[in-house]
């Protein structure tokens, strides 16, 4: 299945953050993309981070011609959990542009998990609740086979104006089962140029754990829950080695909640 991944955080629309010149690639988005690609789906990425309008997605919709648009926000980035109204509206605009072309749309974010009716009202076909890699796998497999999706756990959808909520699934415990994020989908040079011009060094983001037992209201617990799960040291080192060999950052941000 051809799946176009995107997310709804536009750094230029957040003037305070854009002025810092410290954009990080959408880690959660490219993690999900890598997982679906590993399972045999054809994936592409429309990265919104460095642009200022959702209208540019039209080019990717026309050139890639996806069967499914997945707006999959980066749950590792705390900025995406303080959803700004303009970012939400940008997501709605992307949904509308995809639906205009007859493309099905799934959305995964902390905001859509909390406000799923707003996203369904905007035209989304599916809202994926919480941590969504396994949910998205089952959804994509069913869509590819034209099978019924109502039995897929972790989805909210509408059937004849009636909202159907299949309930949340438990979070993943074995994080080593996930591949290294699809860093090849990122225009690394564009990020490097901004970092070096604004800060004099180049930083990339990584996550080694998911979940946190504490109760801060800004973290990723709406997505990854309050059970603490970690990658093995070997799995983490493999990603560090990949990034150092291929992209040569001089700094890493470990964006774990704890």
Residue ranges and their predicted role:
Residues 1-4:
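Extreme N-terminal starter segment of soluble prokaryotic enzymes
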Residues 8-11, 74, 132, 160, ...:
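Flexible loop residues that form catalytic
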Residues 9-18, 49, 83, 158-205:
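N-terminal [4Fe-4S]-dependent radical SAM core
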Residues 14-29:
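Glycine- and acidic-residue-enriched helix-capping/strand-helix junction motifs
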Residues 15, 70-76, 219, 252-255:
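Short beta-strands and strand-loop turn motifs
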Residues 17-18, 81-85, 227-231:
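Short, solvent-exposed loop/turn segments at secondary-structure boundaries
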Residues 24, 176, 181-258:
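Radical SAM [4Fe-4S] cluster-binding motif and immediate context
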Residues 28, 32-39, 44-172:
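Glycine-rich beta-alpha loop elements in corrinoid/cobalamin-binding modules
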């Amino acid at each position: 299945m051809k799946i176009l991944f995107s997310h709804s955080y536009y750094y230029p629309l957040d003037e305070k953050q854009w002025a810092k010149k410290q954009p990080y690639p959408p880690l959660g988005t490219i993690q999900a993309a890598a997982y679906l690609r590993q399972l045999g789906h054809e994936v592409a990425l429309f990265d919104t981070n460095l642009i200022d309008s959702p209208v540019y997605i039209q080019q990717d919709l026309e050139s890639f011609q996806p069967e499914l648009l997945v707006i999959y926000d980066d749950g590792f980035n705390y900025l995406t959990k303080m959803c700004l109204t303009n970012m939400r509206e940008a997501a709605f605009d992307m949904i509308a542009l995809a639906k205009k072309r007859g493309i099905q749309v799934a959305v995964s974010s902390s905001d859509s998990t909390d406000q799923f009716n707003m996203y369904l009202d905007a035209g989304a076909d599916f809202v994926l609740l919480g941590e969504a890699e396994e949910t998205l796998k089952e959804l994509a497999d069913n869509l590819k086979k034209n099978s019924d999706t109502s039995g897929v756990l972790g989805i909210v959808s509408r059937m004849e104006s009636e909202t159907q909520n299949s309930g949340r699934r438990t979070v993943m415990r074995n994080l080593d089962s996930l591949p290294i994020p699809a860093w090849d989908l990122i225009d690394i040079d564009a990020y490097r140029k901004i970092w070096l011009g604004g800060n004099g060094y180049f930083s990339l983001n990584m996550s080694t754990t998911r979940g946190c037992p504490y109760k801060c209201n800004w973290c990723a617990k709406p997505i990854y829950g309050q059970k603490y799960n970690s990658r093995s040291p070997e799995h983490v080192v493999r990603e560090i080695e990949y990034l150092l060999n291929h992209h040569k950052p001089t700094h890493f941000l470990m964006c774990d909640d704890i």
